[in-house]
């Protein structure tokens, strides 16, 4: 998914839900209750959001509830499933219809089929964090240079298509 209010459940979660659409809905229901639409979320105070143009402020949905449900329920932007035509892969769209004006969103997703995967490199990169106890860092921030380093590694190895997996170090404590 190219948007953080639509995504996929990891295969292991789908297996625990018997790959059943009704079970997926039941799984998501408590998160929708925990993060109700229309609560006083700062994200939904569009007049305060400096990153939005005036046109975007007129059309942007109030969807903090969907973002929080996405995060809280463990939805993913990218998942890997073994190919099995009899088993569903659920795309879960949490705000495909703008709750304010009933406009429908269009979604785009990418499916990549492959029959081979091999690790080309395993690199540790440092991510600076602030002194605040709760922090969020954009790995795409050009000041960090992380994506520049990744692109350099891919270019050095001649990789034009593939998958980059980013995760915390195994010995990382007090995280995740």
Model-derived regions: residue spans:
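Active-site histidine-anchored catalytic micro-motif
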Residues: 1-176
């Amino acid at each position: 998914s190219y948007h953080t209010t639509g995504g996929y459940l990891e295969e292991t979660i789908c297996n625990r839900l018997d790959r059943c659409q009704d079970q997926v809905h039941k799984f998501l229901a408590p998160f929708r209750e925990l993060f109700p639409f229309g609560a006083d979320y700062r994200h939904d105070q569009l007049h305060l959001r400096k990153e939005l143009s005036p046109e975007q402020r007129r059309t942007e949905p109030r969807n903090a509830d969907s973002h929080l449900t996405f995060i809280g329920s463990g939805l993913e932007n990218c998942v890997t499933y073994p190919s099995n035509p009899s088993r569903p892969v659920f795309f879960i769209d949490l705000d495909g219809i703008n709750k304010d004006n009933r406009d429908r969103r269009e979604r785009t997703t990418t499916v990549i089929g492959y029959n081979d995967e091999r690790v080309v490199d395993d690199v540790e990169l440092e991510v600076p964090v602030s002194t605040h106890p709760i922090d969020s860092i954009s790995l795409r921030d050009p000041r960090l240079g992380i994506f520049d380093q990744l692109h350099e590694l891919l270019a050095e190895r001649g990789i034009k298509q593939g998958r980059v997996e980013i995760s915390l170090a195994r010995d990382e404590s007090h995280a995740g």
